[in-house]
Structure formats: C-alpha cells, structure tokens
Amino acid sequence: MLNKTVNSKMKPKNSVEMKKLLLSALAIGALAFASCSDDDEPPIAEVVATCNDGIKNQGETEIDCGGPNCQPCTEATATCEDGIQNGDETGVDIGGSCAEIITVSGELTADTRWTADNIYVLAGKVVVGIGKTLTIDPGTIIKGKAGSGSLASALIVQRGSKIMAVGTPEKPIIFTSEEDNIGVGQTAGTNLDETARGKWGGLIVLGRATGSFKNDVTEVQIEGIPADDTFGLYGPGDALNDDDNSGELEYISIRHGGALIGEGNEINGLTLGSVGRGTKINHIEVVGNVDDGVEFFGGTVDASNLLVWAQGDDALDIDQAYSGTIDNALVVSDEASDHAFEIDGPEGSITGSFTLQNTTIVGSATAADGEYADYRSNAMGTTKNIYAIGFQSGKDVELDANDVAQNFLDGELTFEAWQVVGFNNSIFSEKVLKDEADNDLETTIILAPTFYGKSC
C-alpha cells in the first residue's frame, strides 16, 4: 500500500488528431496503390496502441493494457505513476495498491478535506471540532472499524461544527465497514450484502434547533454516544437557533452500521439531533443498519429523497417534537425490520408538528414484526401521500396511547391519501388496553373515512 497517491499522468493523445492521422495514412495508401504497378505493394502504416486514453484499442486486451505495446493487465503489479490502469488499480493510477489508507481518530482540530483518491478509516469516534468544517469530495469512501461500546466507530458533527459532504449520482460519498472490499473509484464491494449489519457505528449530526426534552431541559445527550462524551450534546442550550446550519449532506450512502454501545442502544445509520433548517439533507441512502435508518431528535431540518433498506428496527424515526418536513422517501423492509415509521411527540412542554409525505413503504412477507407505523407519546403532525405494499395480513398503523388518539380526534395528528395495496379494510388501529409490560391487550380498528386513504 502506498503512503501517498502520485497524481502525475501521461497526457492522452488527442482523439481528433488520431483520426486525422489515420485518415491521412489511408489516403496515402490509396494513392500509392493507384500509382504503382502490379508488382508494387502498398506501404503498411503501423498503428501504435494508445495506452493511456481510457479506450480499449489496437490490440489491447483490456482498457489501456495488454497487447504488444501496453503494460500487462490485472495479473500484474500495479504501477501507480505511469498513466495506465493496471494491476489491481480501480482507475488510472488510483485504487487497489495505489490507494492511500488514512486512519483517522479523535477530534479534527482544523478545517479538513477528505478526497476521493484515498480511503479514510474511522478508528473510534471521529469528531469535527467546534468552529471547524469537514469537507468530503464526491466519490470518497469512508470505512468504520469494528467495535462496540466506547470503541464503536462513528463520525460526529458536534454543535458549532459543519460537514460539507456533497456527492453526485455518479460519485456518491460512501460510509461503510472496514470489512467492505469496496475500492477507490467503485460504488459497491462484493463481499457484504444488505443483511450485514452492525459492522461499525454511523453518522451523527448535532445542532442547536428546538427540541422538546424531559423536564424542559435545553440540551441532552444523543442516543448512541456514551453520557461522558460531551461532544454528544444537542439542543439549543443557551443559544437557540432554528436556522442552525450544520452543513450539507447530499448523495450519501451509509452501509452496514449500527454498532452496539449498550444494552438496547445502537447507533442509527444517520442520527440528527436538533439540526436546524439551515442544513441541507437530500439523497441519503441507509442500507443494512442494526437500529433505525434515519432518526430525527427534535430540530427543524428538512430532508428529501431518502432510501432506507433492510433496517433492523424502524426506517424513519421522529422524536422530541421534530418540526421539519420529510419528503419523497422509499422504505424497503426485510425480515429483521420493525416499523416503517415510528413517530413520537414532545417530551416536554414545547410542542412541534412534523410533515411526512410522498413516501412508498414496502413491507416484508417474513418479518416477525414488520408493522406499517407506530404513533406514540403525544405525536403531532401530518402523514400524507403514502403508498404501502407487501405487508403481511394483520399488520397495522398503531395509535399507541390515549393522548395520540386524542390528537387525532382534535386534528393535531392527521393522515391524508394513504393507498394500501392488498387490503379492503382499514389498517389503522388504536391500542386501547395494555398490560404492565406494555403488551397490547385490546385493539380497536378505526374505520373513520377521513382517517385512511383509498385501499385496493
């Protein structure tokens, strides 16, 4: 493995010039044939392979390698500064043996940039320092080391810091496990699938926007971070800012996370604690996380274009009076999944209302739990334009407490335009009686036509 990536490249030959040369050679050959006697033979123009143009041509057996003129192909040792893709390189002079593996731990005390020609390995908690910005280039791969408890790896953007991680559709920024064999320039490895969970922690972003906390405190410790780590605090504290800006997350893939830090306490794929509406979050993918896919603890940030696949608990989770909008999401559950939505309301006197809209939820035919949604703890907000398919018979949308049912009756919890494929009756139910262990003892099906959308 190299200690650094050498960026020198051979300049590729201009394709237009090559075409002119070939046409000229053909024209000269034709003239010679017409003017010579039958005993003369036309000259043969020898065309040399272009070994650094990213095209398989002129005898090359692979792109820019093989044949009589280019370097050996994949069985050869990578040569990382010759302008040719060879050996185990995943691009020209990058990836494989040519990639620098940079291990990162502790606090980032200066503005930092991570680039796509390296692989970054999170060793434990990596925290963006207060007042500092972590910039991650499109196509960059970040891998988390295995570990649990205080050793669980995670990237934490604490209050007062920023992350600028803006990928593209062609070059997403990928957070994954160190076990993943994905390399520089690639978008997927070959050795892990969506059922590989808990291989590392996750991505945590914290801010100072509104949150509703028990006893009306103004800041609390985020789920997934031990209580003695002060960088895990979120909430306004003494500086409420609903427009708080924690940066940008766009075209991000988070895979194989959810490391355990305590009994029943795992890190979510993407955790957002009191994140403000000045932050941009869109095109986020979470695959194979032990706990929730994306969880919103308070805050005002909007999020759009979300995909959660094969989560071990809930796909989209709302808590502590989150009051932003989640728009255009897709949830694909598997046999380990619980709810597509788990929605909790305020814990203190501050209230807030969420909007969750334009979402498709795909259930699992084999999940032991696998419910549509659970609305709990005084939940308030609107869930609309939902398309649900693939859930087992008997699964439902739960109004899981009397205060939630009352919010529905009072118009503070609303449901609009749900289309549920496969059921002609309502899937919405109120849990009206529980035992001491919080198990459901009695359920009432709600058939009010204003409650549920068209079924088919």
Each predicted region: which residue ranges?
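Register-specific beta-strand positions within repetitive beta-rich fiber domains
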Residues: 54, 58, 83, 87, ...
